[in-house]
Amino acid sequence: MANLKVMDQNGKDSGEVTLNDKVFGIEPNESVVFETIIRQRAGKRQGTSKVKNRSAVRGGGKKPWRQKGTGRARQGSIRSPQWRGGGTVFGPTPRSYAYTMPRKQRRLAIKSVLSQKMIDKDLIVLDKLAMSAPKTKDLVSMLNSLNVDGKVLIVSDDNNVQLSARNLAKVKAVPVNGLNVEDAVNYGKLILTQDAVKKIEEVLA
């Protein structure tokens, strides 16, 4: 079990928290993290590309010329794939690019990212994080108090925190159940509350 300093919203010490080694202390598996990010990005693809095959192209119902006697190659439709303006063979059609991964792999990926944050000292734990109203200025002030710069991912169930972060280019706030591998990798610093740590450990430990 590893101990990590806990701070309040003003950047002052507020005790320590003991982190579960099964979640925050494993050997990071980069290949599983990579596969998980590829899966997440695949699930975001629109998959709406579509072309027309010979049955979808308008026209071409009449045989262009008789079968025999003209000296030309036999043709059944002017919308056959070999014709200019004809249908496309094996072209893209609307589909979902999403696919599944085993639950153990998904959990190993997020645990690997959390453990890497611990190794890199990019994990910050707050005793609590709450805002009375959505104010971006207050959130910026809090981040300055914590001496945090660069890209920051905040994990908090407080809706006001999530709304306050929407207008900041390098800050993103997600609920605990919205914590994912791609965001955790893309954002340098990770800010968790003690309640968030507890919920994460309940699921992953």
From Swiss-Prot:
Pfam families documented for this protein: Ribosomal_L4
Record key words, sorted: Ribonucleoprotein, Ribosomal protein, RNA-binding, rRNA-binding
Compositional bias per record (Basic residues), positions renumbered to this chain: 51-71
MF terms in GO: rRNA binding; structural constituent of ribosome
Keyword rRNA-binding: yes
Segment forming the signal sequence: none
One BP term from GO: translation
Cellular-component GO terms for this entry: ribonucleoprotein complex; ribosome
Positions of the UniProt region annotated as Disordered: 43-96
Subunit annotation: Part of the 50S ribosomal subunit.
Protein family (similarity comment): Belongs to the universal ribosomal protein uL4 family.
Function: One of the primary rRNA binding proteins, this protein initially binds near the 5'-end of the 23S rRNA. It is important during the early stages of 50S assembly. It makes multiple contacts with different domains of the 23S rRNA in the assembled 50S subunit and ribosome.
Protein name, as recorded: Large ribosomal subunit protein uL4
Organism from which the protein derives: Lactobacillus helveticus (strain DPC 4571)
